[in-house]
Amino acid sequence: MAMRFFQLHRNRLVKGNSGKALSFSRLLDLSFWVRAFCNYREILRNGLHSLQFNEALDLFTHMVESRPLPSIIDFTKLLNVIAKMKKFDVVINLCDHLQIMGVSHDLYTCNLLMNCFCQSSQPYLASSFLGKMMKLGFEPDIVTFTSLINGFCLGNRMEEAMSMVNQMVEMGIKPDVVMYTTIIDSLCKNGHVNYALSLFDQMENYGIRPDVVMYTSLVNGLCNSGRWRDADSLLRGMTKRKIKPDVITFNALIDAFVKEGKFLDAEELYNEMIRMSIAPNIFTYTSLINGFCMEGCVDEARQMFYLMETKGCFPDVVAYTSLINGFCKCKKVDDAMKIFYEMSQKGLTGNTITYTTLIQGFGQVGKPNVAQEVFSHMVSRGVPPNIRTYNVLLHCLCYNGKVKKALMIFEDMQKREMDGVAPNIWTYNVLLHGLCYNGKLEKALMVFEDMRKREMDIGIITYTIIIQGMCKAGKVKNAVNLFCSLPSKGVKPNVVTYTTMISGLFREGLKHEAHVLFRKMKEDGVS
């Protein structure tokens, strides 16, 4: 059998199937299997840390062919390695195979299986397996229940998860901080913060002291739900209980404050970190740089950027892009380009967001040609433009009167639909607005017709753009006809549509019609 295993891998290597074959050096390492009569126990003891998936499957095959059969303990060691590779369905199938062969599970194997059911989004199977475990005489422990409850959380079955916690307590199994932390973290990551807080209170009632990991999970969850005030209160309660926050705890709240426009609070938290001798990391600095940029304080953002380097925290592409974005928003595109070049000199390549930010920046200062050069540079470097890149570039070209170039870019997008950059409704709206803005109504109507042929979901924004274009071109009668047809299309005019139409009527001297439409707008409750 061992020789057959060895020969199998040698054949794979000879055939050039390097993806499935073991490396030659690894093959030589495995030759001791033959010399030592395939001592799988030695392999289990020494070789699992570097085992690849295909190797693990081959080892399992070898083990089931061995006589006498290995113990369930040995099999479980291997199954645990496969589970760590996130091959949960494979573990479940291999366990079924063992049962068919008459190899009985132990509690550790049952817990491993329970976890695999849950991680592969099959909590209903995990729940029924719990009953099977108990029939086999295994008493579920805290590991069993932690896996099962976590599985219910991952499957958004919150009532069952909470019920399982109560059932566990009734069975005399005392929850510990690890179990609560695992479940609370899962709840927070899936947006069930209220359930997490309820569980947190329950834990306190059982006299279990929370740790920094649990607090950080809750702070993160609250911040992600927009409840930064509650997160801040939780942080204060944490410090009062002499539980020291870590950099991840502070980062969650600093980032939340920045996004809420509470930059002074974010700065105060940063200063508090320093006072507590908690070293900021790149995420901390990047959040603060974003905050300075949002406040228009780009010089302070740059100072923070260089302070980061002096602290041994070297900026990555995200940090550079944040600073570039700040300068672009302040229309200091030359400074933004200097930062971009500095980033390149340090061996960092801008990503799609970096280039899109620069394209938008040059568009806003009326430099469409430079924006297009940046786009060309992006493509030549192999950085893939996404739909937002194209939309930003189209807006830049149209806004600056480069309609022909915009149409060329649009046609390029249509050709590259298979690359995942097909025009979306926003692309069409940008182009339609640009064409109408530049007096190209006929071309706009052709593009609009293309949208209809593609059976796109045309909404009120698109119709309003066309109505505005018609009014601008003096085609008010056409605009009125299109406006009146909206109800039959299932589209309701908004205040912008009404205002556009009323203004168009006034410009044509149709004051009575404009007043009638104004009254209708009021009657329809549009404001």
From Swiss-Prot:
Chain positions of PPR repeats: 36-70, 71-105, 106-140, 141-175, 176-210, 211-245, 246-280, 281-315, 316-350, 351-385, 386-420, 424-458, 459-493, 494-527
Subcellular locations according to the entry: Mitochondrion
Keyword Cell membrane in annotation: no
Keywords: Mitochondrion, Repeat, Transit peptide
Family: Belongs to the PPR family. P subfamily.
GO cellular component terms, semicolon-separated: mitochondrion
Residue span of the annotated presequence: 1-35
Name the record gives this protein: Pentatricopeptide repeat-containing protein At5g41170, mitochondrial
PANTHER family listed in its UniProt record: ATPASE EXPRESSION PROTEIN 3, EXPRESSED PROTEIN
Family annotation (InterPro entries): Pentatricopeptide_rpt, TPR-like_helical_dom_sf
Main localization category: mitochondrion
Pfam families assigned: PPR_1, PPR_2
